[in-house]
C-alpha cells in the first residue's frame, strides 16, 4: 500500500520537487489546508460495515471530511470518527459497498462538514446528503454552515409563548403547542402519524383574532421536512400533499429512503436543522421542522456503534444516544433579536408499541412533552387516534389563557382530562361488575367518554377547527354533568360559560378568523 504525494507546482526554492511539495503540504496541513497541495492516500487497511480504517495518515483531525475516489471514478465522502496515532476511522455516508482496499484513494479536506444554504432551497427536494434530486440546478449558496450548528447562549433564548393553532381539537385544547417548542409524536407501525403530521403542516398558524393589528400573514412561514429510512410511499405522500395544498414553494424536503445508505441517516436531520436555522435566524421565517422516523436514525446510530465495537447500552443502543439525540432536539426555539423560530415535531415509531423502549424513553426526557398515537383508538376507526392521557405539552401553560386564547382554556382542559380519566376507570369497572352495578354518576362518565371520543377526538383529516370552536365543543361535552360535578373549574368561569347563551355571547366577537 503506497502513499502517493500529489506533486503539484509549488516546491520550495533550492530543493527537489518532491521534497518541496512534502514541506509545502506539511505547512498547508498545519494551516488547515489553506493552500495546496494535499496528500492523496491509498492506505485503506480494512472496511467494517459503514466504517473504513485508514493507515499511515498524517494530521488527521476529528470530524474532518474525507473524499474517497473509487476505482470506477465515483466520489464518496466520509467523516473522521476517531484518530489513533497514524490510523483514522472514517464513516462513509454513501456506504462502503464497492470500496476496494487496494485501489481506492482518499483525500483529507481539512474542514468539517458544511452544507450550502440559501433561501432558494424552499421548494426543492434533496437526498439525505443534501444533493438535489428534483432535476433542478445545484443550490447557489448564500453561506456554508456547519451541520452541527452553533451553540446558542441559553440566556439569549426566548421562552415560547405564542400558541400554534393546529386545527386538531385534542392538541389545541389539551396539549397546546407553542411556537419554538419541540414536541414529538409517539406512534407505532401502521398508525396514521404521517397523516397527522401532514394535517398539522396544512393547518398550522397563530391563533388569530378578528380585529388583529399584527401581521399574521403566512409569507414568513416555512416547513423543513426530513425523512430517514422511510419507504417511497411515505415520501410520495408528503410530497404530493404539499403540492396539492400549494405549499410546496414553502417546503424544503430531505429524503433518505429505506433503500438509501443507513449511515446517511446520521447527517440527514442535521442538514435539515442547519437549513431551518438559516431560514429562521437569517431569513427570519417561522420554521416547522418535521423529522420522521427518529427510530431509523437511532438504529443507524446503533449500527455505527456496533461497527466500532463500543460497549452497548440498553438493547444494543450506544450509551451516548441521549447526548446525540439532544444535539438534534435542542436545536429548536427562539433567539433574542431574531424574528424567526424553529418548532420541531419529530415522529418516532415505538418498537412493539413499547413506550419504555430507549428511543421514546430518552426522547421524552429531552423534548417538551409528547403526542401519543394510540392503536386501540385507531382500531375503532377514530381519527386522529390521539390518546390525551399519556400525551403532554410542557409549555402549554404559558401559551394559553386570556390574551392568547381564552380565559377558560386551562380550566376546560383540566376538567376534560379529569372526566376522561374517570370515564376510563368506570369503563374498566363496567367490564368487571356489569352496567347494572354502576351508579348514576358512573353512567354520566360513561356517556361523556363515548361522546368525547366520538365528537371531540374524532374529526376529518381536512377538518380545521379553531381553538374557540374546540373549546365550545369541550363545554358542550361538560354540560353532560351538573355544575356541582365540575370540580376543576372555578365557579366564576362556570357561571360565565356553563349556560349555552353565555358561551355563545362570549364567543361571538372572537371567532371570525
UniProtKB/Swiss-Prot annotation:
CDD domains per record: ATP-synt_V_A-type_beta_C (cd18112), ATP-synt_V_A-type_beta_N (cd18118), V_A-ATPase_B (cd01135)
Positions with a binding annotation for ATP: 394
Keyword Nucleotide-binding: yes
Highest taxon listed in the record's lineage: Eukaryota
Tissue note: Kidney; localizes to early distal nephron, encompassing thick ascending limbs and distal convoluted tubules (at protein level). Expressed in the cochlea and endolymphatic sac.
GO CC terms of this entry: apical plasma membrane; basolateral plasma membrane; cytoplasm; cytosol; extracellular exosome; extrinsic component of synaptic vesicle membrane; lateral plasma membrane; microvillus
Statement: the UniProt record of this protein carries the keyword Glycoprotein: no
Disease implicated: Renal tubular acidosis, distal, 2, with progressive sensorineural hearing loss: An autosomal recessive disease characterized by the association of renal distal tubular acidosis with sensorineural hearing loss. Distal renal tubular acidosis is characterized by reduced ability to acidify urine, variable hyperchloremic hypokalemic metabolic acidosis, nephrocalcinosis, and nephrolithiasis. It is due to functional failure of alpha-intercalated cells of the cortical collecting duct of the distal nephron, where vectorial proton transport is required for urinary acidification.
Record note on domains: The PDZ-binding motif mediates interactions with NHERF1 and SCL4A7.
Descriptive protein name: V-type proton ATPase subunit B, kidney isoform
Organism: Homo sapiens (Human)
Gene name tied to this protein: ATP6V1B1
Amino acid at each position: 500500500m503506497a502513499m502517493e504525494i500529489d506533486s503539484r507546482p509549488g516546491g520550495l526554492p533550492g530543493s527537489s520537487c518532491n521534497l518541496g511539495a512534502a514541506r509545502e503540504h506539511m505547512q498547508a496541513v498545519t494551516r488547515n489546508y489553506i493552500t495546496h497541495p494535499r496528500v492523496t492516500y491509498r492506505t485503506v487497511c480494512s472496511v467494517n460495515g459503514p466504517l473504513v480504517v485508514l493507515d499511515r495518515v498524517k494530521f488527521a483531525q476529528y470530524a474532518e471530511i474525507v473524499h474517497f475516489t473509487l476505482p470506477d471514478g465515483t466520489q464518496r465522502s466520509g467523516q473522521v470518527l476517531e484518530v489513533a496515532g497514524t490510523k483514522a476511522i472514517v464513516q462513509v455516508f454513501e456506504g462502503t459497498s464497492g470500496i476496494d482496499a487496494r485501489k481506492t484513494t482518499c483525500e483529507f479536506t481539512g474542514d468539517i462538514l458544511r452544507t450550502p444554504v440559501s433561501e432558494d432551497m424552499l421548494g426543492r427536494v434533496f437526498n439525505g446528503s443534501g444533493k438535489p434530486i428534483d432535476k433542478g440546478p445545484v443550490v447557489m449558496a448564500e453561506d456554508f454552515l456547519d451541520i452541527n450548528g452553533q451553540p446558542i447562549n441559553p440566556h439569549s433564548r426566548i421562552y415560547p409563548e405564542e400558541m400554534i393553532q393546529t386545527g386538531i381539537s385534542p392538541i389545541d385544547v389539551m396539549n397546546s403547542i407553542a411556537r419554538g417548542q419541540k414536541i414529538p409524536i409517539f406512534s407505532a407501525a401502521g398508525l396514521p402519524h404521517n397523516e397527522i403530521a401532514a394535517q398539522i403542516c396544512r393547518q398550522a398558524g397563530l391563533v388569530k383574532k378578528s380585529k388583529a393589528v399584527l401581521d399574521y400573514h403566512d409569507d414568513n412561514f416555512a416547513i423543513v421536512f426530513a425523512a430517514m429510512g422511510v419507504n417511497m410511499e411515505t415520501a410520495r405522500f408528503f410530497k404530493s400533499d404539499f403540492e396539492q395544498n400549494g405549499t410546496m414553494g414553502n417546503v424544503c424536503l430531505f429524503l433518505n429512503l429505506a433503500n438509501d445508505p443507513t449511515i446517511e441517516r446520521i447527517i440527514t436531520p442535521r442538514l435539515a436543522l442547519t437549513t431551518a436555522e438559516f431560514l429562521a435566524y437569517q431569513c427570519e421565517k417561522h420554521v416547522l421542522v418535521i423529522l420522521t422516523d427518529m427510530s431509523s436514525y437511532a438504529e443507524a446510530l446503533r449500527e455505527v456503534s456496533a461497527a466500532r465495537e463500543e460497549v452497548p447500552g440498553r438493547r444494543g443502543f450506544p450509551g451516548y444516544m441521549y447526548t446525540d439525540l439532544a444535539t438534534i432536539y435542542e436545536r429548536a426555539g427562539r433567539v433574542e433579536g431574531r424574528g424567526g423560530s424553529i418548532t420541531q415535531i419529530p415522529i418516532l415509531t415505538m418498537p412493539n408499541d413499547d413506550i419504555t423502549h430507549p428511543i421514546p424513553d430518552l426522547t421524552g426526557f429531552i423534548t417538551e412533552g409528547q403526542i401519543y398515537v394510540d392503536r386501540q383508538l385507531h382500531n375503532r376507526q377514530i381519527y386522529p387516534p390521539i390518546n390525551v392521557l399519556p400525551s403532554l405539552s410542557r409549555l402549554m401553560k404559558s401559551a394559553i389563557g386570556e390574551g392568547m386564547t381564552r380565559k377558560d382554556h386551562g380550566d376546560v382542559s383540566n376538567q376534560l382530562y379529569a372526566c376522561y380519566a374517570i370515564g376510563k376507570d368506570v369503563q374498566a369497572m363496567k367490564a368487571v361488575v356489569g352496567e347494572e352495578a354502576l351508579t348514576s354518576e358512573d353512567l354520566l362518565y360513561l356517556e361523556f367518554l363515548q361522546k368525547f371520543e366520538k365528537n371531540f377526538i374524532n374529526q376529518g383529516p381536512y377538518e380545521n377547527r379553531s381553538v374557540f370552536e374546540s373549546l365550545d365543543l369541550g363545554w358542550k361535552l361538560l354540560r353532560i354533568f351538573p355544575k356541582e360535578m365540575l370540580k376543576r373549574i372555578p365557579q366564576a368561569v362556570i357561571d360565565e360559560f356553563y349556560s349555552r347563551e353565555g358561551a355563545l355571547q362570549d364567543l361571538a366577537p372572537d371567532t371570525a378568523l
